[in-house]
Amino acid sequence: MYKVFLKRFFFLFLVISQIRGELIIIHCGILIDGESDKPQKVMSILIQEDKIIDVTEGYVNAGENDNLIDLNNFTVLPGLMDMHVHLSGESNPKKYMERFTLNLDDFAYQSTMFAERTLLAGFTTVRDLGGPINNSLRNAINSGKVVGPRIFSAGKSIATTGGHADPTNGMKYELMGDPGPSKGVVNGIADSRKAVRQRYKNGADLIKITATGGVLSVAKNGENPQFIEDEILEIVKTANDYGMHVAAHAHGAEGMKRAIRSGVKSIEHGTLMDKEAMGLMKKMGTYYVPTISAGEFVAEKAEIEGYYPEVVRPKAKKIGPKIKETFKRAYESGVK
């Protein structure tokens, strides 16, 4: 009786919605919904006010004012999510010179191309974890000016002096200067707090820190810890005060464990994660974002003479291939 009532109620709801012209109806030849054990054939998805309100068997008839999307010859599945992207640029042999040859306007224009490519590849939601224009790109997409996925933006990453995301790494001394918290370079608790507040002011959705060295930075160490624990604690505390979580880039185990103990929400890359780190992640509820394809990519490109600066190549060859193996161990141990 309850099921009959629901069906009648839903039929009435459909009639009302059709009269108001509020429905988008998608006819799916094959539907992979992410929950069923196998693909389902001849299905309809009903959408109202940007929300899926029902998925039902058969092809629901569209009302006069409804928007029907006929995909009866296609396979339909939910949009994919990528939790670690950088839409302002791409890896190429000219990347390191682009810091000196491209303006922010140039990065902004090319980011629209990368955003559209990402959406057309099936990714409808992404976390952009560090870039010069990602807040503005998100706003442009949300306002309908640019085609792209829904973006949760970290704004500019937060690093320490000489750390992985210090924008002056590899420059001559006269150009290095002292970038400071607004540019994402911190030293000490006060700087750490200020950098988070600056990103909140700039419209970030979350905070990204580089807890260890990195592969692509122009620095010889790709795994050393780069924050003291008190700095990370302050970043996490301040971010939480402003309703944001913290994602931590980390390759080496020690810097990773400092970040996990401090309460970051996710570990990015996690290449040299050890058993202790895995145990801490399970205890703290920390998520793991392995970036497997990035590891494979940098290892492959490191074999090409001149693709990366010489200081980067050995790091890419060492760290890149290990991510896939680490992911397997982390998954088997129960890390989320």
Task: Please name every model-derived segment.
Residues 24-25, 31, 35-77:
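Histidine-rich, glycine-flanked metal-binding segment
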